[in-house]
Design a protein with these regions (language model features):
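Bacterial N-terminal signal peptides
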Residues: 17-29
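N-terminal, active-site-proximal structural segment of metallo-dependent hydrolase catalytic domains
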Residues: 11, 30, 34-116, 132, ...
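Surface-exposed cleft-lining segments at the edges of enzyme active sites
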Residues: 72-77, 151-160, 188-203
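Structured beta-strand-rich core segments of catalytic domains in phosphoester-bond hydrolases
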Residues: 41-47, 99, 103-190, 308-309
Length: 331
């Protein structure tokens, strides 16, 4: 009897370590599978082949009033936030970015839009306390983990109309493999030098603050790739953008390996004009006419932009004057 007990005990001792190995494998497997691939891989408009991260950027036009402008009423249209919010939700769910950046994001629109996209898995990285953040970053919670977030409102107030000009920076870790990158979303001062002398230098100074912020981020997290996106209210050839390019920032459309949209990304949409596909920018092309930009700083040369696109779906024309920008890249 004693021998049989020993044999039985040995079997248990052998079995238990194998059981632990199997359980450990299952836990690791579940962990990997729960850290999903980019949501854009299953979106209506799927992630480009060989890309693994998607950024979607848009200035969504702050119209926080609860009245319909006469021009819109004459067109039989309604630009109020509760009407436009479902269309922005459609945009976001059609493309399902890992990272979403918005400008002119009012608290009024937040009440309408955020509940819609939160249920899709998006988290706002900085909800304002004292100051409302008009330039938020959202991330897809199942694929991304924030390591660092900062909001900065530009000063002095003369270059920051109603507190709307700011930047939000975020450092994100991809849950599936731990790779880290950063995104900075901004909206710069809007007037020309003719309207308000010093405006170009104000924008240049605001971008210098972003460049300093990027240096701080990279000092802390290493030479990670950084995307700077948003409505910069100036063309690529101007001093504000050229200072960034001189420091190694590259416009994403110029390095996209599979597709690069070259339109200026802007059209008529406002309370007084209604909406149309007419563009009033300085030029029809991106280099000379665009004011919405996406630049990449990648000193290691490991990040590849696959697609840079300007989304011109018909329904977007009457929800904002800025066509949304999309960047698919391989981290």
């Amino acid at each position: 009897m004693r021998d049989s007990v020993v044999v039985k005990d040995m079997r248990v001792r052998v079995f238990v370590p194998w059981l632990l190995v199997v359980l450990n494998f299952l836990v690791v497997s579940v962990g990997v599978s729960s850290a999903q691939a980019s949501p854009a891989s299953k979106a209506r408009y799927k992630l480009a082949e060989s890309a693994d991260v998607r950024i979607l950027d848009d200035n969504i036009w702050d119209y926080s009033l609860d009245t319909i402008p006469p021009k819109w009423k004459a067109m039989g249209e309604d630009p109020r936030d509760f009407v436009r919010a479902p269309q922005f939700e459609r945009l976001i769910t059609d493309y399902m970015p890992d990272v979403l950046t918005l400008q002119e994001y009012s608290s009024h629109m937040h009440d309408e839009l955020y509940p819609r996209i939160a249920k899709e898995g998006y988290v706002i990285a900085w909800e304002s306390g004292k100051d409302w953040n008009n330039t938020p970053v959202f991330y897809y919670e199942k694929t991304m983990e924030p390591l660092y977030v900062k909001y900065h409102k530009y000063t002095p107030a003369q270059w920051c109309n109603r507190g709307t000009k700011s930047f939000t920076s975020i450092v994100l870790k991809r849950k599936s493999d731990g790779q880290v990158f950063s995104v900075v979303n901004t909206h710069l001062w809007w007037k020309s030098d003719q309207m308000q002398p010093g405006s170009t230098m104000a924008r240049a100074s605001q971008l210098r603050l972003i460049m300093a912020e990027v240096e701080i981020i990279r000092a802390r997290f290493g030479s990670i790739p950084v995307f700077v996106v948003g409505d910069m209210n100036c063309e690529e050839k101007t001093v504000p953008l050229q200072q960034m390019i001189a420091e190694g920032y590259v416009p994403c459309y110029k390095v996209a390996v599979k597709h690069a949209d070259n339109s200026n990304g802007h059209h008529v949409c406002g309370p007084d004009d209604g909406f149309s596909t007419e563009s009033r920018r300085a030029a029809p092309d991106r280099e000379n006419g665009a004011i919405d930009h996406c630049l990449l700083l990648d000193t290691e040369g490991k990040t590849e932009v696959i697609v840079f696109d300007c989304i011109m779906d018909e329904y977007t024309v009457k929800i904002t004057d800025h066509y949304p920008l999309l960047v698919d890249f391989k981290l």
